[in-house]
Amino acid sequence: MSAESHPTESQMTPKKLFYLTLGSIGVVYGDIGTSPLYAFREALKPVAHDGLTRFEVISLISLMIWALTIIVTIKYVLFLLRADNEGEGGTLSLLALLMKTANGHTAILMLLGLLGAALFLGDAMITPALSVLSAVEGLKLVTPRLSEYIVPISVVILALLFVVQSRGTGAVAKFFGPITAVWFLVMAAAGISHISDDFGILAAFNPYYAVSFLLHEGFYGVVVLGAVFLTVTGAEALYADLGHFGRRPIQWAWFLLVFPSLTLNYLGQGALVLGKPETMSDPFYLMYPQWALLPVVILATAATIIASQAVITGAFSMVRQGINLGFLPRREILFTSETNTGQIFVPSVNAVLFIGVIFLVLSFKTSDALATAYGISVTGAMVVTSIMAFEFVRARWNWSLPVAVIALAPLVILELIFLGANLLKIHDGGYIPILIATAFTVIMWTWRRGTAILMEKTRHTDIPLASFVSSIERKSEHSPAQVPGTAIFLTSDPESAPAALLHNLKHNHVLHDRNVILTIRTVNKPRVPSQDRYKVEQISERFSRVELLFGFMESQNVSQALATLRKAGLKFDIMSTSFYLGRRKLVPDANSGMPYWQDRFYILLANAASLPSDYFHLPANRVVELGSQIIV
């Protein structure tokens, strides 16, 4: 289900609401739905070093339930789902919205947004590795002889998952929701069946246990919080996938199925450990009888594959947003569905994620080891989102400063505590998500900054378009020869004569019957209605200026968009139209405004970018490229 296809809240029929709710269970809640596989197990380890007490077990479950309540229910389900950018959610969508109203702190907001996006991309590497490993590890309970095959089996599953990305998931995506719904029901049933082991576990609903535990445990309490946070990993997907399903389906799925199922399962795990402390080694799988283990492992593996698919798709979508907003160089984007433009495949991103995921599996080998590295990227992304949400309620909802502080400061403080708890795990692998996020942030910041410097340098040597057209339209003996047809010159600055136009005149001494100065601009909203797609200005008899507007969630298909210009009186015969593009050779300069290494890195990114003709879907046999050299 795509954002392009779901109706508005008021138009949603009960049937549509049901299918969107079911779909959201697989895509939105797949990640958080796999947390019971390892969250409670990891939380038990720091407190079980000197024996496990009844108070500690109840307190851990209490911490998990209240983490789900405060962070997921209150922050995401009830609050953030309303902070949308024309129906879209996610870090970059929120950043695009805030950039419209940023007053004096644009750079800080941008850096925060880029950091949040980078942390999400790091999460997209860790989630598949951790989820699949934790599911496949159930095989060692089926038969210990399979223990040595857990890593190879996980690698094969993940390799197949990334290989099939290029073929799209449309054919099987309709099963994601039902399979994940069954997964939640199975978890709920297991939890219910074991709560009777010790009804005392129901005391976990009392926040006294959570608070008292933290106050009495001291350092160990902080360490435990890092593991407790695994309970809410995947919550960012609620906001990121807002545009795919809408607010109501996501909320209904949470309150009717996901939240109750997770709560019941954690209560069941807690009751099991209270009754049988020896089960703390793997309380999730040990809730099931021996005959049910293999089916549950298979179902768990399917659920983790679906969760991994959702986060991979989210990474593709975020990269497309980043490219359209100018934070990333153009990359090849393929569409895997003829009817759903939301189903995309980005080969370069798929390759990077695949290499990263396999590296993590082979390096950490167990979900225990990998879980220590998981929380940092998620907590970091949540803190960034909360800070940006503070700016949102001030700028868009006009909340006063005291109201915004009272409402959001407790959330930010809580998440900072969780972040601090996770940072304690840096030496145990927590440095991995930090390195990944740093790398992606440097890439995006370098591209954004380098492009701004490049624009500034070219602006100094540009000729105003109005002056150029005025001079060229004066008939004289030096006037260039006129040739039939249409020439379209792509430029990022509609006020200046494109470099390709100047080079064409300089080297070929010709001018076409009709010349279109074309600018492609991405606006800070998800989509642009077809009637607002273009702006046309007739400069002279032979020159016109056209601006094509795209939302950051849209494919920038220029050939298709130009066809809509017929309504404005501009008709293009593709066989007599040539597209002129400027190709720049960039030379590093130590005094450009960026360090020399960053200049070199920017040039590397620029050289690796997809060709404009490919990215903008221009007919290859109608494209002419003219080069120039620029020092950056």
From Swiss-Prot:
GO terms for molecular function: potassium ion transmembrane transporter activity; symporter activity. It is a multi-pass membrane protein. GO terms for cellular component: plasma membrane. Transport of potassium into the cell. Likely operates as a K(+):H(+) symporter. HAMAP family: Kup. Belongs to the HAK/KUP transporter (TC 2.A.72) family. This is Probable potassium transport system protein Kup. It comes from Rhizobium rhizogenes (Agrobacterium rhizogenes).
